[in-house]
Every structure is written in structure tokens, then in C-alpha cells.
């Protein structure tokens, strides 16, 4: 397998998911400097009404976000990546495969929405979610 560095291409941007029971966030870092170039999260103003409704519901749910919210966060990230000219990102495959099963489905939804929006997600095709 030929690496991008040997071909003279710059290393790809790294997409990282930050997942908890309260929120899901995704950030894209620059390859050499590790600075964040784009970010989206489920606690942005667009999701406040949904979060409030979910938190005041009885019985309470354990997660404050689901696959639908994760997909919308992915769409927002893809729009921001298009705005700055990033067309390809890479995920840490080992980290994604080590996630608990109940976080994998929404993570797959988020990564799939980024890919459907036109940003190539390297490594997404190797993930197998339940």
C-alpha cells in the first residue's frame, strides 16, 4: 500500500468524535499542527429546543442525543468543511472500533452524513457497526 506521504500528498485531516451521554461533538484537526479547523456539537443553539424537550421528558432517557441528532451534527460539520475547502478527512479506526456498542450506531450515522454531504471519510468503509 502506497502512503500519501510517499506520493507527495499532504497527510489528511483527522476527524475525532467526542462522545458522552450528554452530547456528541466532532472536530477536525490539521495534519501537522493539530489545531482544530472545524467543529460541530449537539449542544449548539440549533439543538437547544430538542435537548430541553428530551431532558424534561419522563421517564428520562439516558442519552441526550440519538442517531438523528448525530446525523445533523455531521451535516453541519460537512458544511463547515466545504466552507474552508477540506474535501477529505481520516478517522482513527482503532478508536472507533473500541467504542461501546450503544455509541457506535449514532457515530455511524454521523460519519455517514459527513460522507453523504460530499466529504470523503477515509476508513469509514472498514467500520462494521451492529
Locations of the language-model features?
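Flexible, surface-exposed loop regions and adjacent strand-edge segments
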Residues: 44-46
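Charge-rich, low-complexity N-terminal segments
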Residues: 1-24, 31-37, 48-130
Amino acid at each position: 500500500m502506497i502512503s500519501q506521504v510517499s506520493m507527495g500528498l499532504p497527510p489528511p485531516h483527522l476527524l475525532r468524535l467526542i462522545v458522552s451521554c450528554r452530547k456528541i461533538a466532532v472536530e477536525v484537526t490539521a495534519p501537522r499542527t493539530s489545531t482544530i479547523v472545524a467543529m460541530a456539537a449537539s449542544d449548539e443553539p440549533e439543538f437547544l429546543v430538542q435537548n430541553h424537550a428530551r431532558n424534561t421528558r419522563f421517564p428520562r432517557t439516558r442519552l441526550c442525543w440519538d442517531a438523528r441528532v448525530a446525523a445533523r451534527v455531521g451535516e453541519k460539520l460537512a458544511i463547515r468543511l466545504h466552507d474552508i475547502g477540506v474535501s477529505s478527512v481520516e478517522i482513527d479506526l482503532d478508536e472507533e472500533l473500541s467504542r461501546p456498542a450503544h455509541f457506535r450506531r449514532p457515530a455511524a450515522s454521523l460519519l455517514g452524513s459527513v460522507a453523504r454531504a460530499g466529504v470523503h471519510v477515509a476508513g469509514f468503509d472498514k467500520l462494521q457497526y451492529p
